[in-house]
Amino acid sequence: MKTRITNLSLILILAACGIIFFAGCATTETANTDKTKSLLSQAGFRVRTPQTAKQHELYASLPSNKLESGTVKGKVFYVFKDEKAGVAYVGGEPEHQRYHQLCMQQHVAQAPEEEMKHPFAESWSNQWGPRVVHP
């Protein structure tokens, strides 16, 4: 009987951990989507709501939360479908390039800085010549 209770406890603990894990993943996905939409807007992508039957058909065929590219009459365009809001972010090559610049800036801004270990830092700084302190 004690083994059965222990097994039941283990199952409940694993189930709770699974629920917490998947809830955390959903929260992370939402945060990433919100960040992407913000960067797309900053880059100049325009928010469009499908109006015609053809637009609704095209919108329905797009994958959600993924930046897709297409070419029409030699012009490249990019679309990000926000299914939750029922809109698409649409931009051309200049907006796409700006989006990538913003992503890089955001990534670099969030990169952690690490302090060099003392012996390595000292040997690194000595490579640039003697230190001169100006009054």
Residue ranges of model-derived segments:
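Periplasmic N-terminal soluble interaction domains immediately after the signal peptide in Gram-negative
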Residues: 62, 66, 84-93, 103
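Post-signal-peptide N-terminal segment of Sec-exported extracytoplasmic proteins
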Residues: 42-80
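C-terminal partner/receptor-binding element of secreted or periplasmic proteins
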Residues: 94-135
